[in-house]
Structure formats: structure tokens, C-alpha cells
Amino acid sequence: MSTPDPPLGGTPRPGPSPGPGPSPGAMLGPSPGPSPGSAHSMMGPSPGPPSAGHPMPTQGPGGYPQDNMHQMHKPMESMHEKGMPDDPRYNQMKGMGMRSGAHTGMGPPPSPMDQHSQGYPSPLGGSEHASSPVPASGPSSGPQMSSGPGGAPLDGSDPQALGQQNRGPTPFNQNQLHQLRAQIMAYKMLARGQPLPDHLQMAVQGKRPMPGMQQQMPTLPPPSVSATGPGPGPGPGPGPGPGPAPPNYSRPHGMGGPNMPPPGPSGVPPGMPGQPPGGPPKPWPEGPMANAAAPTSTPQKLIPPQPTGRPSPAPPAVPPAASPVMPPQTQSPGQPAQPAPLVPLHQKQSRITPIQKPRGLDPVEILQEREYRLQARIVHRIQELENLPGSLAGDLRTKATIELKALRLLNFQRQLRQEVVVCMRRDTALETALNAKAYKRSKRQSLREARITEKLEKQQKIEQERKRRQKHQEYLNSILQHAKDFREYHRSVTGKLQKLTKAVATYHANTEREQKKENERIEKERMRRLMAEDEEGYRKLIDQKKDKRLAYLLQQTDEYVANLTELVRQHKAAQVAKEKKKKKKKKKAENAEGQTPAIGPDGEPLDETSQMSDLPVKVIHVESGKILTGTDAPKAGQLEAWLEMNPGYEVAPRSDSEESGSEEEEEEEEEEQPQPAQPPTLPVEEKKKIPDPDSDDVSEVDARHIIENAKQDVDDEYGVSQALARGLQSYYAVAHAVTERVDKQSALMVNGVLKQYQIKGLEWLVSLYNNNLNGILADEMGLGKTIQTIALITYLMEHKRINGPFLIIVPLSTLSNWAYEFDKWAPSVVKVSYKGSPAARRAFVPQLRSGKFNVLLTTYEYIIKDKHILAKIRWKYMIVDEGHRMKNHHCKLTQVLNTHYVAPRRLLLTGTPLQNKLPELWALLNFLLPTIFKSCSTFEQWFNAPFAMTGEKVDLNEEETILIIRRLHKVLRPFLLRRLKKEVEAQLPEKVEYVIKCDMSALQRVLYRHMQAKGVLLTDGSEKDKKGKGGTKTLMNTIMQLRKICNHPYMFQHIEESFSEHLGFTGGIVQGLDLYRASGKFELLDRILPKLRATNHKVLLFCQMTSLMTIMEDYFAYRGFKYLRLDGTTKAEDRGMLLKTFNEPGSEYFIFLLSTRAGGLGLNLQSADTVIIFDSDWNPHQDLQAQDRAHRIGQQNEVRVLRLCTVNSVEEKILAAAKYKLNVDQKVIQAGMFDQKSSSHERRAFLQAILEHEEQDEEEDEVPDDETVNQMIARHEEEFDLFMRMDLDRRREEARNPKRKPRLMEEDELPSWIIKDDAEVERLTCEEEEEKMFGRGSRHRKEVDYSDSLTEKQWLKAIEEGTLEEIEEEVRQKKSSRKRKRDSEAGSSTPTTSTRSRDKDEESKKQKKRGRPPAEKLSPNPPNLTKKMKKIVDAVIKYKDSSGRQLSEVFIQLPSRKELPEYYELIRKPVDFKKIKERIRNHKYRSLNDLEKDVMLLCQNAQTFNLEGSLIYEDSIVLQSVFTSVRQKIEKEDDSEGEESEEEEEGEEEGSESESRSVKVKIKLGRKEKAQDRLKGGRRRPSRGSRAKPVVSDDDSDEEQEEDRSGSGSEED
């Protein structure tokens, strides 16, 4: 059989392994020495014999089958247990067991327990190289004790043998006894670790050395003791064949190798062939012991055991005595198995070396020679394997490579094994030292005794352990019991305390709960009465509670209301006094004239051309008392003719409702003035009488009934009974003392009927007029404030004979809408729309002066601009639309209206809820009623800090806050009327708002991610001449850029241009599908708009940015949608036409594109029923205004508001902030938060929180599908089904298109320059920052001479003679010629050097071309012109208004780009007064017109950036007019001064004056001549005084410095 492959890449063995197991030498290659598996193989030859700690004898003669041996052991054990050891059968079986048990290969290897019981060391703790063996109690633990029949008998003179013969007959013959004794002695010597003498070895084997054998011994090597050493030759090594095994060494059990299988019956592992008979035995070179044992060892014939799996070579002839079945014939049936009679040898025997020992070979030399040969073969083999040809087959090459690597690992394996052996030896020595008796015993015990002893010892240990554990357990139990008793005692004590504590706490909790319930009940009752305005009950509860703070608040409220009531009374009394004086004057004028024609209410005579002439005049028949009114009554213009034709009629006296009192009442009141004031209730009751026109007498019962009804109608503050019980009038009743019922609208209002709540609003407005008060109509947007205002005007014209003029101030965007409403509702009212160019406005002046108009509509701007025209008219009523623009008391509009315009009656219209700033609210009330609301600080103190004076904490609880708000409401209620849609207009269709989340396209996502993380926008690199390579662009105001990206990425022009080139479009504009594929919002619109058009729903689309509207127009053109557009650039005259076109019933335009700011105010677009807010505004009221363009009176359909919001973007934060603002505004006022101050740190933190991307819930981030969107926009089921079919058709059509693309752009469609990772973007950003930091290159600076060319004496002389310019020019020429001379001298002296320097100059010029090109040279302006400019600019800057505030303060210097980046994005040409002054100094302006352009540009920039009506906006308008007037004034002064100066100069030339005076005159003459020369076009050199010396400062820009130098250079030419 072939040898198995060597493990671990070792070289193949030349022959089979001779031992019972694979040789470990196979892993290291063949070795001539001892087996590497042994403990001594790595350490060289051992100085002594191998340790006999674990003897493993070789094959003996008695080889029995394993099964027979197991069957024999059972009766032996049973006989031993029955006490039958003397039975001859027992001794016979025991002898057979001893002979067979000497062979370890008779069965499977013993278990660890068997090893322990038989003296073998345990594999876990035993050592292979113990110095003393473990005593064995069985026959298998000793060396082989059986011998063949040819064994030599022991010496007859042995006393032990004699003793045994004397004891009686023995079953052994003499030779057997000698052999047995020799074996016992050898066993004892081996047990003590002593060497065996040669004669003892021969006696143990039962043989005598014969002469023939002794001669052959040197030639035959001794048999191998271990199966681990392979033969050195190519032949098969010695196996377990015939030949004696030396008893001085046996391989320990289990040392065959880590992977060696257990030995078979013959000691050979499975698969390993045994040695054929007759093979040469292998010598064992083991030091001197091997030399000693070699001549005495003789081959022993052994019978191999029966093979278990396969046949083995035939053994030699076996004597009958060695048969495995039959006992030896020479033996008696009983065999000596008891070793008891043998006395062990206690004395150490000396080592005996026989004399006849032959001279053998030196094993060390043989070992060295073998090692040399092996090393040479290994080296040769490695060379062969390294030089193998490359044409070998793959499997052969693999085997050769494995063999080469194995040979190279040989030394490493040797070192590793040596280290392992060293470690094992060290450990073994330590264990042996600690337990010296582990491997020896002095007394041999039988197996039974050992077992009994072991059993008793085990029982004793178990008992001791049990007692110890029991004692310890009792100790622990006592401790635990004590701890348990201790805890139990304290637990009972603690439980009693807890019960007591719980009982006390329960008592107090119940008491507190009951008290809390009672307090809550009282507080709820108090709040209920407070909300129900039951002040008497509320005060009683406050008295019961004895809450000082609430009582103090109520006391303060009473004081404030009492003060305001007194102020209202004073105001009304003052107005009545004014009316009396006015009427007295009229009466006197009438008496003086004697007979007066019919006059109007304003004292002017009526004629046929006036508007009043068309109104009917009420007349009464003197005798019958019949009154003619309405159509039966004569017209005012035809009154005199009608009275002549109808005698007996006269003009009926005016009632109290139309006139504050008759002349008789006035006289009575005048007489009553010196008398003490009557109780407040009586005059009010008299005033409240409204007599019926048909009957002058009214009963007292009716009068009282009317009074009570009027009180119940208007007094919503307190009940009538409570007011009468206190004997006081309520604040509201005092304010609206005079009441008048209004049941229907004026006859002048046509084409519509007012709704009931609008009639109530008209009644409230008329009540304000009757009580000489002004107020705020603050109905919610869409409830018809414009219509109610027109109703008031027509009512006053018809019933009060107030013909006007009425001044209505409106925003420019709503002026056309007002005109449209007037034309529709009151066409008979003469109105003037005062707007347009200056020439157009001047055309209205004659009509305004004649007074032939009723209403003048104008804007805030023209009120300020044309106040010199409009303020001359005495207005009867001033009405301001969008009145919240007046919230700033210091704004220009408020100041102009208060100071220049005369209008006793004022009305504010606003649909926006009142803001949370008290000064703004006070500003509105102060504008309306300056005599009542005088001081802002007092007003703010009333409501802002009620406890500031008491020293208590200012924080207010909910109840106190409600009291403060009610206090404010109580103050506002007489002057403010506000109704909500849900309260007054039940039939108005509902408005449903949906927020639709839109996904981003891949382009949007990439741009958004980098803008959010780094604040940079990706570009294609074209701005840096790196087109296609990519780049970045840092932009300010990151939030604005993120909003642009969310709307549409093409709002960045370079992105669209790069993409158009990438997609193949020309002109830099993207068209077609890619317009909506680039934006998620546009893609949603592309799905929604076709459905809305198919179902005839008109759409209002509101955007924040006009550039986005332009992109949307391209999309509408691509889809073929008809649309209209209105933004801030739309002219006022065009707006009305756009509204009319869109609102027409059959209009083809179904989309109206509006900007939120320009188109969200005052427009009436109720023909649309769908509002799409493309992007939300920071101010939520702007979006509400936009929604109410459609959701207003007249709307017949349900209104759907769709607010688009990009998912996971900054728009979600803006929407959340807007909702928060709306929630705050619902309270109207929050106590303690009126100032609304926030630090810059808080604002930055808020913006940072918006920029941070937070993870949202998946449900919130879910983009709705088509079905969800259809549910949002569908009004009923039929529309929903239609929309679903349209979606299905669209998807089918897209599927049929072979070139179809996804609805939104994906990343694989993007160009390479936009797909950058974060590291690349960081690199590009750093490059851009470095370029900004270091610049693009150096710039050549010119040399500047700051020294004076003339001395002071020379300069004075030149001034006197007038030759200053000539002298300076000469000096300049001298310097230049001197410089040229130096250059020419240097050039002539070194021509080569000059050539080099010229080359260098040329190179430097080429290098400097990267800088800014030289500026255009400017010649200085005339001094007179510069002086004029400075004078005008200084006058404009120093202008102050009436309050002493300098208007130009914010215009002097603009904020930097970092502070206000939005300004520089919106304003293309920023300019301020500082820059204007610099340009004047640098002679940039050639005339006053150039200066005027920049000043007007400055004002226009302010008006563009700021909201209309803001303070800066108004100041810019004033500064424009100031500049114009100052310029005209200076030009006039200049003309007059020119004439006077000519006269003065003539007189000065004739007279003789001082020298200094003559010098000044000459200077003036020189300036005059120069100015005239310039006007004629001639050129003169400027004088010294007019020459602008270049000055370099840090503030000047490089460009201006170069212009200065170039300007000075032009003087040299």
C-alpha cells in the first residue's frame, strides 16, 4: 500500500512508518535520530535511558483476540467477588490475562478513568516524561512479563526462588520462576527509575545469549522501541514484526500525533502496513543506553495478533506454548499471578556493563552523517523544484509548489516543536516537584484494596464536605433568620408610621381637593360671568375672593373708562360748539343778504350745475301739513320755480336725524350754557328722540320705548337695568348717544341690494357721523367694506344733504377697483380718479377748484406729492382704505394728513386684524380722535403694565389677561366694528384649504443639498473659464436661495443656460417638457390645470417672485393655456381692464397670474373659485388677502385653496412660522408681549433652526398620489370620476410614447458638472474663497506727487497776476523734461541694459493686462458748478421735517451687502449720498441734470425696496421734492447773483480799495470768465482753486483713485 500524503507539506517518506501510528517525522522529513514525536527528539540524544514513566511493551507471544479477553475477564471478576482466588481456574485465567494484557494493541486505548486506575497518567494532567512512573496495580501497567517457551530459567541460587520452592509445590517450573523473578525485579527497578542490567534484560526475556547470536548482534541493529522513527533507507522500515522490543523505553499512550488514529490490535494504525517478516530491524540510537542494550538484545519471535480488518503477512512458526487458545504444554494449570511473595529490591543496584560487549559504531557520527545527507537532499530537492520548467501541467505544478513550500517550512516547524517541548518540560517539571509521590509507591496494593481505599476515601471526603456544608449552612441560616427578624421588626414599625402618614396625607389631600374644586367652581363661575359681561355678579365674586390684583384691575378699568367717557363728552361738546359757530355765521350772512336762494348744507347756493340740484327737497303744505318726499318732491335745482307754481308749500324743516338741532333748540342751548349741567341721562334721552316726520307729537311712553330699544341695540357693554341701577351711562352709550335707525339703502345706490349685516354697518357708520366721532370699519376681508363706504356716502348725500367733497385714499392697486364699484353701485355720484402723470393730474385742477364733484379717489403718493393742490379743499369726509398703513404715527402720510388736510370726519377701512403692538393701535386711534387719545405713553401704560406702579410682578395669568383684553375691547368698541364671515354671512360658500406636498426633481435635490449645507450654488464653471468642469458660486441670503430652488431651478439664469446647452436648446432658454420636469411644483400643476380647465374652474395663481411668473408664462405658452398677468409693474389704468376681462362670463382666460403683494389687495375676482398659492409668504395675512380675492361677497361656488409646499424643505418651516403668527394674531392682544421685541441672537437662532434639516414623520412627508390630489380639487363625485379617467388617459398616452421620460428629472439625466460629492464641492468652495481672499493679480499703481510745485510766495504772486495755471504748467513740463533727460542718459550709457529694461517693461505691461483697464480721463468741473452741486446736496441732506427729524439719515450711507443682502439682489444700481458726494468731488457729474438723475435714482431705489406707505418710502418722496425746489431756488439765486456781481465788479474797478479786496475781485473775475468760456465751449486750464488734487484714502475705491489720477493727467496735456 502507498504511503499517505505527508501532512503540513512535509517531504514524502522513503518507506512506511514502523510504529503504531503515523510518524511525526513525516512532518519534518526523514530523520536519522529518534522520532521527532518523542520528547527527546528535539533535544538530541538523551544522556540516560528514556523515562519509563509510561511503559508500553511491545508485542508479546500471547496475542489473544479482543473478544475472548473480554469474555475471560467477566468470570475472573465474578470469582474474585465470591472470594475464590485460590481456585486453579482463577490463576490460569489470570496468567493468560497477564500475558495478553502486556500488549497495548489488544483493544481500543484505555479511557482516562482506566488509565488512572491502572497507573497511566491522565491525558489532561499526566506527563510524557515523568522521572518516576505511577505505580500500577494490574499486570498491564508493568513491562512485558511473559516470555516465550525458550526463555532461560532463573538462577537456582536465588533465595527468593528457593523460598518459593520451600513453601510448597508451585505450578511454575524453574525457568519460569527465574523469569518471573527477573520480571518482578525489572519492574521494581523501572518503578524506581533505575537502569536494567543486561543480564537482567536477558533473564526477563527468558533467554540466554548464545555464541551464534552474539556474533550476529553487531550486524543486526536493535529492534525499534517506538513506532515513530522511519527507516533511513528506501526499504520498508521495521514494523511490529519478530524481534524483541527493548524494555528500556515505551512510547507513552496517545503520543502518536495530533491526528493519529487509535492503534489497531497489532499496534499499527489503520491504513499503515506492518513490516514484512524478515525485514531488517531498525537501530535505536538513544545514547549510551542504546549501545549497552544492542549486543544483549536478541530477536524474539512474536505471534502477531489477529487482524481486525485485513490480513497481515504470515508470522513465523509459533511454538505450541504460545498459542492464543491453548495454555503452554509445559505449564501446570495454575500459574503464579500473585506478586505478593516477591520482595521488592530497596537497595539501588549498581550499573553493570558486560565485558563481552562488542565494539559498535558511533551512533552520534551516524546521526550527524544522516542529518548531513538529509540536508543535502532537501537543498537539492528545493533547487529542483525551483528550476522546474514552466510547461508542467497544472496539477503537477500545484503539487510541486506545495512540496516546495513544505520544505521551506522545515526549520520553522522544528523551532515550533522545540518551543512546545520546552514549555511542556517546564510545566511537567513543576508538577513533579510539587507532587513528588505522584509516580511512585512503596507498597503494591491489589486492585480490590485500591478500590476499597478509594471508595472509603471518597465516602470520608463526602461526609466531611457534608458536615462542613451543614455547619456553614446552619451558620448562614442563623444570620439570615436574624436579618429577617430585624427587617420584620422595622417593617412593622415603618408600616405603622406609613399608615399614620398616609392617613394624615389623605385627610389633607381630601381637604385640598375639596377646596380646589370649590376654587375652580368659583373661578369658572367668575370666568363665565366675565365672558357673559355680567359685571355686577363678577364684582361680587371678586369681593368674595378678595383678590387684590383683580380688584385693582377692575378699579383701574373703571378709572380709565371714566376718563375716556369724559374725554368723549368733551370731544362731542367741542364739535357741537364748532357747529354752532358755523351756523351762526351762516345765519348772520343770510340776514345780511335778506333773501337767499336755496342753499346746500355746506352753505353754498344751489344751482343747476351742482350735483345737489338733482336731489329731491322735502316740502310741506302750510295749511294741511302734507309733506312731499322722494319722487313727488321737487328737485333742488327747480325748487324756486316749483314753489311759484304751487303756492301754499314751503321747504319742510329738517328733523333731528338730519340736523343736530333746530335754531330754537340752539338758542335754548345757548341760554342753558351758563346754568349748571343737567343729569347726564336727560339730555341724552332728548337727543335720542326721533320724531316721526308725519306727526310732531310723540307720547312719553313711545319715547321711553324708543330709548330702551336704542340702548339694547347699541349697548352691548352692560345691561340697561345695571346701568340705570348705578345711575351711570355706559361708555358706549355716551359715545353713541344720538342714534338713528337705517332700514334701507339710499336711493342713489342702484344695481344691487345691501345685505342685512351691511345695513347694520351703514347704521353704525351713520351713528358715528351723528355723534361727531370717527372710527374703524374692520370687517373681515371679502365682506364688502367698499360697498358699505359707498352706501355711507350716498346716504349722507341723500338724507344729510352732505354733498361732499369726500376724499378717499386707497392703494394704487385698488384704485381702479374702487372706480369700478362706484360706476356699478352709484353711477350718479361724480367721482374724480386723481392719478396719472403730472400733466394729467394738472388737468383735474379746474374741476377741483370749482367743486363740481362729490368723491375724489387718489393714492397715498399723490396725497403727499400734490398736497399744495389737494390740501386747499375743505373735505367733509376723509376715508383711508387699508388703514393699517397708518399704524406708524411718524410716517409721512400720517403727518401730511394731520398737518395739511382739513377733514373733521375720518374713517379707516382695514380687513387685517389689529396687530399686537400697542403703539400701532394708538397711532390709528390718535389719527381718528386726537383729542381723546392724546398720549401714546399713557395709552401703553394703561394696557401694557397694569401692575408696574404697584411693585408687584408684571406677569399676568389667564383671567387677568382676559380682563386686560376686555378693557381694550371696551375702549375700542365705540370706534371699531368688526364682523367675521362665519358670523354674518351664512350663505357664503365655504372655503377649503389644502396643503399639497410636492416632491423635488433630482436637479432640485442636488442644488438644494449643497445650498443648504455649504451655502453655494453649483455651476458649470463657465464664469471661471472652466466650462464643463464645474464650479461653485457662493450666494448670500441662503433662505431666499432655497426658496428659489424649491420653486424652480431655472430661476438661476446660469443654471437654465447651462441646461439648455446640455439639452440641446438654443438661446439659453429651456422649452417643452423639461420646463415642468425640472420642478416638482410645476409637475403638479401640469396634472392639475388640465382638469380644472376641463371642468370650467377659473384659477387664481399667486406667486412671490416675478421671475418665476416669467417661467410660468413659458410653461403656459407650451401648454396653450390662456392667462392674464398682474404684478407690481402693471400700470394702474391697465389693472381695471384686466379685472374686467377676467370676470366676463364668457372669458377665454381661465388663469389669472398674480403676485401676492401687488395682486392680493382689494381686487374683486369672485368669478374664480380655485386659488393656488404657489409659494407661501412670511406674512400669513398676505396669503389670506390673496385667498379673499375669490372668497368674497358674490361668490357662488365653493372655493378651494391649494397651497403648494415642497417636502422636506425650508417652505415647511415658513408655513409653520406663518401658522404660528396667525395663532398669535387671534388674540388681538397678548398682555406683556406688546413690544414684540426680539434680539438679533434670537433671530439668528430662528433662521438657523429653519436651515437645519430635521427628520419628519413619514406620514407628513408623504407626497400625495393622483387619487388624493383628485379628491382635493374635485367638488363632487362626477368631477372625481372625470379626473381619474383623465389621469388614466394621460398615463396610457405616456406609455405609448417610445421616447417617454419620467415625470421628474432623475440623476442620470444631469450633466457631470452638477453631480459632485461633498469633498469636490468643498474643494471648489475653497478655491472660490481663496480667489476672493487673494484676488486675481496685482495692479500697477501710478506714482503720485503730493508735494506743492510752488512756494507760498510764488503762489500768491501768481494769484495776483492771474498766471497761476501757466506757472504750474511750466513747472510740470520742467519735471517731465527732467525725467525724460534722465531716461535718455541712462539709455545712452548702457544700451544693452536699456534694451533689457525695455523688454522687462514690455513683459511687465503684458503681465499687468490682467488688472482693471485705465479709466477714462476726466477734466475737472468749473468751481461754480461744483459749488452748486455741493450746496444742493447739503441742503437736501440737512432738510428736517416739522418734528425736527432729519429725513436723509438713512440715505447717507447704505448698509453693507452682508447686513442687507436682499437690497443688493433687488436693486441693480445702489447709490447713497456718500457716493454722490464722492462723485461730485471726482467731477463725475458734468451738469446738474446728471446729479439729479442720481438723486432721483436714490429715491426710486428706496421706493422700490420699501413698502408703499412706509416711513422710508414717504421720506424718499419728500426728498425728491426738496431736491427739485432747492435746485430751482439755487438756479434763480445764481442768475440774480450774476447780474449783481457784474454791477459790483464795475463799481469795484472804478473805486480804490485795499490790496486784499483787489485780489478777491480778480479771483471772482477769473471765475466768471472761465464759466463763460466753458459755456461757449472753449477750453481753459483750470485755476489752482478749481483743480482737484488727487487724494488717496481707504474709503475711495481703486477705480475712483485711477480716475482722479487720470483727471490730473489730462491737465498735463
Swiss-Prot record:
InterPro entries assigned to the protein according to its UniProt record, in alphabetical order: BRG1_ATP-bd, BRK_domain, BRK_sf, Bromodomain, Bromodomain-like_sf, Bromodomain_CS, Gln-Leu-Gln_QLQ, Helicase_ATP-bd
What name appears for this protein in its UniProt entry?
Answer: SWI/SNF-related matrix-associated actin-dependent regulator of chromatin subfamily A member 4
Location of region: Disordered: 1-177, 198-351, 577-610, 647-699, 1366-1427, 1530-1613
- Which portions of the sequence form the region RNA-binding region which is sufficient for binding to lncRNA Evf2? 462-728
Q: Record's family?
A: Belongs to the SNF2/RAD54 helicase family.
Show the segment(s) annotated as Necessary for interaction with SS18L1/CREST.
Answer: 1-282
Q: Which residues form a coiled coil?
A: none
Domain QLQ, first and last residues per copy? 171-206
**Sufficient for interaction with DLX1 as annotated region, ranges:** 837-916, 1247-1413
Its catalytic activity?
Answer: ATP + H2O = ADP + phosphate + H(+)
**Protein location:** Nucleus
Q: Matching PANTHER family, A to Z? A: SNF2/RAD54 HELICASE FAMILY
- For the modification N6-acetyllysine, which residues carry it? 188, 626
